[in-house]
A protein has these predicted regions:
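Non-heme Fe(II) oxygenase metal-center motifs and adjacent flexible, charged/small-residue loops
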Residues: 1-213
Length: 213
């Protein structure tokens, strides 16, 4: 494991206890090196806009790596060992992703986390994810690890019911968000990437690592 994949500066690696079961690790990831691995994965399993069961196309472009990949189509939401576009296995999960996820989960108090699925989301312009629960996994005792790269975005946590009050936090490049325990089934979503005030660029990539099986 390369130490360069993680920030060791205590000023940039602040662990914030956002709420019960929710932890934010500021500047924990080296997005430059992680993005190099994302490009390799997406060369084998290109990003695509999946459809939800109702037929609407998602604004977020997605791909997967690891033994299992999350997919959505007219048949519903599910994990699959193969890419439905090609019938091939998803690309192997890079060691860098696995190492980052297990280290972040441990830092947040969730030991023995072993992700078998990594969803790659690309947010361009107005792309966003509305409030939802992650309920397609088999073991809800396992946390979720979310890695932000690129443009800033506002992440929201609701409660265990869709209409519960929401709390917001700003996610920035290199931030890692971990939630589990009492927060595992909380509704959550993320807004569109925020444009850089200097360049106008608004591109965000996110890794979501889970234990799905």
């Amino acid at each position: 494991m390369s130490a360069r994949l993680f920030s060791v500066d205590s000023d940039s690696q602040r662990i914030e206890h956002f709420d019960d079961g929710i932890f934010l690790l500021r500047g924990f990831a080296n997005s430059t090196e992680l993005m190099a691995q994302v490009r390799i994965v997406c060369a084998s399993a290109p990003l695509r806009h999946m459809t939800v069961p109702g037929g609407k196309q998602m604004s977020v472009a997605m791909s997967n790596c690891g033994p299992l990949g999350w997919t959505s189509d007219s048949s519903g939401y599910r994990y699959s060992a193969t890419d439905p576009r090609t019938g091939n296995s998803w690309p192997a999960m890079p060691d860098a992703f696995m190492s980052l996820a297990t280290r972040a989960a441990t830092a947040a108090g969730f030991r023995n986390f072993k992700p078998d699925a990594c969803l790659i989301n690309e947010y361009q312009s107005k792309a966003k994810l509305s409030l939802h629960q992650d309920r397609d996994e088999c073991d809800f005792t396992q946390p979720i690890v979310s890695v932000s790269m690129g443009a800033d975005a506002v992440f929201q946590f609701g409660g265990l019911r869709r209409n519960d009050a929401k709390k917001s936090l700003l996610l920035q490049d290199g931030d890692v968000l971990v939630w589990g325990g009492p927060a595992r089934l909380r509704y959550h979503g993320v807004g569109p990437p925020l444009a850089d005030c200097r360049t106008g660029a608004a591109l965000r990539v996110n890794l979501t690592l889970r234990n799905a099986a």
